[in-house]
Amino acid sequence: SMFKGWFNSSLSNYNAFVAALLNGKLKEMNIYMNEVALSTFSSFDTGTHPSERTQPERFYHGFVLGLLVELRGRYEVKSNRESGYGRYDIMLIPRDYNEGNAIVLEFKVLDLESEETLEDTAQSALKQIEEKNYDAELISRGISRERIRHYGFAFEGRKVLIMEQQ
């Protein structure tokens, strides 16, 4: 139908990050975030002192949330809500459960006391999604586990690493 054709081509109307996220293209998501962070953010935005640990996390959270707002026609975009045993950072719930995957995003800043690399931090974010059972809300709505994707975002200053739960 004409509507379906328009809908499929509408992916090209999304920003590069959103298009990569919806298509599960992890490499492109990483390239986009790192290019934007390097060219746009200052160390003032992203924080450099341990006392500012939650600030960079909030900054990146707000930035990614801003990128995702344009999805609100296709997804419920939820931020800092309770599910399972804690509060997830961002959850995208498809308005049509047969159209697209549900997505859970968790953000973490590299903690040099417990982590050595951005990989450790991204893994820690993914582990938090599992351990705190953030999928509970999605599963209670009838979305199957196969349709749920998890992304852990790790930050250190203007460096970003995004990993996906395999």
Regions found by a protein language model. Give the residues of each.
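Nucleic-acid nuclease catalytic cores
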Residues: 122, 133-164
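Extended alpha-helical interface modules used as scaffolds for assembling large macromolecular complexes
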Residues: 1-133, 160-166
